[in-house]
Each structure stands twice: as structure tokens, then as C-alpha cells.
Regions:
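Short, function-defining helix-loop hinge/capping sites that tune catalysis or transport
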Residues: 15, 20-22, 82
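Histidine-rich, glycine-flanked metal-binding segment
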Residues: 1-6
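Active-site gating loops and adjacent loop-to-helix segments of metal-dependent hydrolytic enzymes
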Residues: 19-53, 109-113
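Histidine-centered catalytic micro-motifs
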Residues: 7-18, 76
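Active-site loop-helix segments enriched in His/Asp/Glu that coordinate
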Residues: 47-113
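Single, functionally critical "micro-switch" positions that shape active/binding sites
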Residues: 9-13, 42-43, 67
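Gly/Ser/Thr-rich beta-alpha loop segments that engage phosphate groups in nucleotides
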Residues: 9, 24, 70
Length: 113
């Protein structure tokens, strides 16, 4: 006998985090959450361009699908590549066959604009 289950839903993902693997270690060891943000995640998200966003979304979606996840809510930030970033994520996920809802993180850490 076999059973089929519906696809899983990941309600909080950062698809660009697929690019964190292989990053050089931070210059200092983070000892708290703020330090982790500053030393790892904010270094990564400020370096993103549209091509990196597209490929990281595709990789993240493929890895999710491989584990049975068919729908993702992606929380994205790329202060250097805002225009078109959510479309790049949506297109990459569609190519893989994963449903996605994209949300752009709003912050003032790069200034009021």
C-alpha cells in the first residue's frame, strides 16, 4: 500500500539564503542575533543583483521541492536590486513548479528612502 500526501507549505523562507553556503566566515564571531544579521545576512543581501536573486530562488525552490514543499512564502531583501527582484523570484519558482508568495522586507537600515 502506498499513500500520497499533499505538498508542504513553507510560510517563512529567505530563498537568497541558498547563497550563504560557501560564504567566507565573518570577520568576527557574532555573539547575538544583531551580530548575525550584520556579519552574515546583511552582507549577503546588500551584495545581491538580479541574476543572483534569480539563481538563488531557483536553487532554493528546487531544494524545497526535493523535500516535498510545493508552496513558499519568501521574505526578500536586496537593497541594491529592488526593482524587478520579486518578479525574478516568482519567475524562477514558476520554472521549477513551486508556488510562491513574495514579500519585500521594508527597513530603514539603508536610510529613510
Amino acid at each position: 500500500m502506498s499513500a500520497t500526501t499533499p505538498g508542504l507549505v513553507c510560510a517563512h523562507h529567505h530563498l537568497y539564503s541558498a547563497l550563504a553556503r560557501g560564504m567566507p566566515p565573518p570577520p568576527e564571531v557574532a555573539t547575538d542575533f544583531q551580530g548575525i544579521l550584520e556579519q552574515i545576512w546583511w552582507r549577503l543581501d546588500t551584495a545581491l543583483d538580479l541574476e543572483m536573486i534569480r539563481w538563488s530562488a531557483k536553487l532554493g525552490a528546487l531544494e524545497a521541492l526535493e523535500q516535498g514543499t510545493t508552496a513558499i512564502v519568501d521574505h526578500h531583501e536586496s537593497p541594491g536590486a529592488i526593482e524587478g527582484s520579486l518578479d525574478a523570484i516568482a519567475d524562477a519558482c514558476a520554472e521549477v513548479g513551486v508556488r510562491v508568495v513574495c514579500a519585500y522586507g521594508v527597513t530603514d537600515r539603508h536610510g529613510a528612502d
